């Protein structure tokens, strides 16, 4: 048990270095189920401006408004709260505005669930990251237990 705790401290330290790097970061967190990825990320998120979204086995039409509602809640912007971002361009614009207010952590936990229902998601995220996300004061964490799928997302023909 003590050894596992030490490993987690090392992982937290690595995440902290990415957090304080002063630049945009896109960080994959992968591993088998039940090894503590979510717990690690929840601990890391404490005290940070964070949007922590747990992906589901649902399509984008259902999940994007849920993610948009979390973005709106963090922003506190009455306009966004009244009409949370429900399209990718609106969500990305809201993330850009939020990042101007200080370092922002966006965690997409169990991303393979969402990708299973929307295969276009990796290319959409990659295009946004390449064109805009990498310029923001943002740390994007892509987490998943489906190790093979995460490997394809990160090392395939168009890696994130």
How does the language model describe each region?
Residues 1-160:
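Phosphate-binding site recognition
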């Amino acid at each position: 048990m003590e050894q596992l705790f030490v490993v987690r401290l090392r992982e937290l330290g690595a995440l902290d270095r990415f957090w304080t790097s002063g630049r945009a970061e896109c960080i994959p967190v992968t591993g088998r189920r039940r090894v503590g990825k979510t717990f690690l990320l929840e601990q890391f998120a404490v005290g940070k401006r964070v949007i922590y979204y747990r992906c589901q086995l649902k399509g984008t039409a259902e999940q994007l408004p849920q993610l948009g509602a979390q973005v709106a809640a963090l922003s506190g912007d009455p306009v966004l709260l009244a009409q949370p971002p429900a399209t990718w361009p609106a969500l990305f614009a809201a993330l850009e505005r939020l990042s101007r207010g200080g370092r922002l952590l966006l965690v997409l936990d169990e991303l393979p669930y969402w990708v299973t229902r929307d295969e276009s998601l990796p290319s959409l995220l990659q295009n946004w990251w390449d064109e805009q996300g990498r310029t923001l004061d943002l740390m994007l964490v892509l987490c998943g237990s489906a190790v093979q799928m995460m490997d394809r997302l990160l090392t395939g023909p168009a890696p994130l």
